[in-house]
Amino acid sequence: MSYDERANAHPNLNDESDVEEEALVNDYREQVNFDDGMSELDRTTSLGAASQTQDLQAQLAAAATPLEYQATLETKFASYDNYCSLFHYILNSDGPVELEVPSYYWAWDVIDEFIYQFESFCRYRNRVARSGSNEEEAQLLRENPNTWGCYSVLNVLYSLIQKSQINEQLAAMKRGEDPAAFAGEYGSRPLYKMLGYFSIIGLLRVHCLLGDFTLALKTLDDIEMNKKAMFARVMAAHFTTYYYVGFSYMMTRRYGDAIRMFSHILVYVSRTKNFQKGGNSYDAIAKKNDQMYALIAICVALHPTRLDDTIHSALREKYGEQLHRLQQGGPEALPLFEELFRSACPKFISPTPPDFDNPALNVDPVDHHTAIFMDEVKNTLYNPTIRSYLKLYTTMDLQKLAGFLDVEPEKLRSWLLVNKQRSRQVRWVEGGLLEGETVSANDLDYALEKDLIHVSETKAGRRLVDWYLRNLARVY
């Protein structure tokens, strides 16, 4: 797809007329609605219909092949053109493309690599703009602001979903109806069905990278999070889905749901790791595995809860001392919270091109989201200390507690009110991922009556039957 004077950067591409460029601008204004049917891809530098059909198998294989790590900027531009050419052919051909999918996981590989290249290009572009050290590359990027554009990538994913009518099929399955009745001409083909399905997972990932965590969770409304789901058949897709869902829950302060998501996939991985060794995605899964343990450590520090024995043992082994420091709270824990968050969070991207003329104005998206998260952590820094005092009393004077903590009474009152509000979390029960019921996240509750604090504590009994069953299974 040759946009914005790409001809100057790539002499072999055809020049575009002023009329086409004006039409492109109009397309991008409308793309936020994602209902234009990929019409802008008509301006893609692509093969003719006959030759493209003959070479489609090669294009499909190339689309699922990772780009070299040290690929040049021209190679990244060319890769974008190739993806646009491929998706244009699949979406805008006269009727469905009759093609046998190379493998059941091929569609995931295509969507995964497409989004990875988009993510890495955005981060690279932001890095060049902020450093201001390579004027030649900065000029190329400045002249091609729509290459790997956010709207283009989102438009591809939404178009694949709409073309395949995959959401309608999934909704029918949840109602116990025949999905084939809702598939339509395109959705009945495996090529479109699989691309559409994994585009939903792709949207979850992209919206999370852009920082819209609520919309990220909303995209999975029609997908059931269980082992029977289609994404569970592809280990990398299975892992990716739970990572981004769990992270989105964490960033929306639903720590209990985040822990549940992370724990589910980590237990699954611990039971299947011997089968994964030697696989193409083993290293990537191992890295994400460590990241999720770091995120669980953060969530448990912010939302103390009982973990699965397998997760608890692994967490103690990996982050024993660090977890203890996180749970102690206080200003000393802040650097550790930030370190773990930066090491485990997605590599966030900006939805718009950077300002190449004013490098100082460009903000690293990771820094931005880290600052937002750390503001939340600062609100809960003294919760462990406050809890340790409140657990000793049923009623306590505000002035007395302020004296123990060496803070002003009104500041303590503010902390208590914030903590009580934060302790009310939404917990998923059924339905969409955003749905749930509001519950108290702590086993310690309190109420303020002027300067008197009334404390109540509920202790959950140990489920000894479950403990015995798990350990008997290990012995026998």
From Swiss-Prot:
InterPro entries in the cross-refs: eIF3l, PCI_dom
Record's keyword annotation contains tRNA-binding: no
The protein's name: Eukaryotic translation initiation factor 3 subunit L
Assembly behavior: Component of the eukaryotic translation initiation factor 3 (eIF-3) complex.
Protein localization: Cytoplasm
PROSITE patterns attached to this UniProt entry: PCI
Biological function: Component of the eukaryotic translation initiation factor 3 (eIF-3) complex, which is involved in protein synthesis of a specialized repertoire of mRNAs and, together with other initiation factors, stimulates binding of mRNA and methionyl-tRNAi to the 40S ribosome. The eIF-3 complex specifically targets and initiates translation of a subset of mRNAs involved in cell proliferation.
GO molecular function, one term: translation initiation factor activity
Classification lineage: Eukaryota, Fungi, Dikarya, Ascomycota, Pezizomycotina
Origin superkingdom: Eukaryota
Predominant location: cytoplasm
Domain PCI: 257-452
CC per GO annotation: eukaryotic 43S preinitiation complex; eukaryotic 48S preinitiation complex; eukaryotic translation initiation factor 3 complex
Pfam families (UniProt xref): Paf67
Keywords: Cytoplasm, Initiation factor, Protein biosynthesis
Family (UniProt): Belongs to the eIF-3 subunit L family.
GO BP annotations, alphabetical order: formation of cytoplasmic translation initiation complex; translational initiation
